[in-house]
Amino acid sequence: MRKALVILALAAICGGALYYFRDNMPWSADASDDNGGAPNPIGDIDQPLPPTVVMSPENRWVDLSKAYKGQVVYIDFFATWCSGCTDEVPSLIRFQQKFGDKGFQVVALAIDDEGEEKVDTFVKRQFDVGGTQTSMNFPVMMGTMEIAQKAGFEGGLPSGLLVNRDGKEVKIVRGVVKEAALEKAIARVVKQ
């Protein structure tokens, strides 16, 4: 009987904590139908993108805080083993197609421990985009967890940062997000 009461009390405490944190995290305040009625994992931030030096596909060091100044950039933190990361690639390809001529650039930052060879194989894959097999149409940079955290990565994949034309991080994306919600956020920043 005592064991059952302890379990019941723990369940009540956990339930209360989940309820509290669900409604008090920064991304829950802007819940939206664009994310299927679920709390929107897109939160507002306002800070400069710090110097973030990564290895480009051409094997050159690139500082993301300078290389894309004047463009809206979505930095996608991913790993090849992350199924949510793989699932969002077609959306990222579509965003690049739709907004690329408006000064928008997707930049993927691989934070795999699997190594460059595994990432190269992943990048060469074809993805189904509206019934058409398409390659990634954006650069994939090699990074580390330390580099990603310096840029603003808070842990958990998939994850991303939306950076405005002035080099300021304006949106942080935590976890899987509905394509429509992310597209809406990108469109707003591109129009600014």
Question: For each predicted feature, which ranges?
Answer:
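Thiol-based oxidoreductase modules, predominantly thioredoxin-like and allied folds used
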Residues: G103-K118, Q133-M145
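Thiol-/selenol-based redox modules, centered on thioredoxin-like
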Residues: G156-Q192
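Hydrophobic beta-strand anchors of alpha/beta hydrolase catalytic cores
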Residues: Y74-I75, V106, G160
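Short pre-active-site segment immediately N-terminal to redox-active cysteine/selenocysteine motifs
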Residues: Q71-V73, F77-W81, G156
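A short beta-strand-turn-helix
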Residues: P51-V73, Q96-F99
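N-terminal targeting signals for export/organelle localization
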Residues: M1-P51, K171-I172, Q192
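Short, internal strand/loop/helix patches
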Residues: V123-R165
